[in-house]
């Protein structure tokens, strides 16, 4: 797997904020999480047409059996590519909390149990942090892209801290308890416009878009 370095990508991508002069690129986002799908659609430039799993007739549960974000993203992307023969990418995201030795990490989505209940996940996280002064945390998102038979990976991250209690009604997942560094409000309070500019997933999306620009793929 080729891992695209953020520094290399940003050096080129900063020359232009948009992917100008590119043909439409069709990609399947290998996720059953509709919140993620809509968030990524809002972030990626219009030159990238994002297909849902349903639009590729892949309606099966995606495998997620690895013990790393990178492994899970690769497993899901490979599964969808083999099923549909469609260029695609998958993601896995983890919240890593310093005082909990990196937990919940790869278990972020099902921290409190297999039902993937966001409210229960946040409640358990806040309980486990009771009495701990260090609330530093980071969100990491890893994208695995399979494009024309080649595999690439991109990583976005954002530092911050865990709030004392859940605040805000926006977003999804752990957004009500994650305060990005430099801010005093949670992602859920800040709203989608701010989150989609700052977040770990936004950074990974920018790297993905910049990959197509710098690689010359799709240029007219």
Residue ranges and their predicted role:
Residues 7:
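Alpha-helical and His/Cys-centered functional microenvironments
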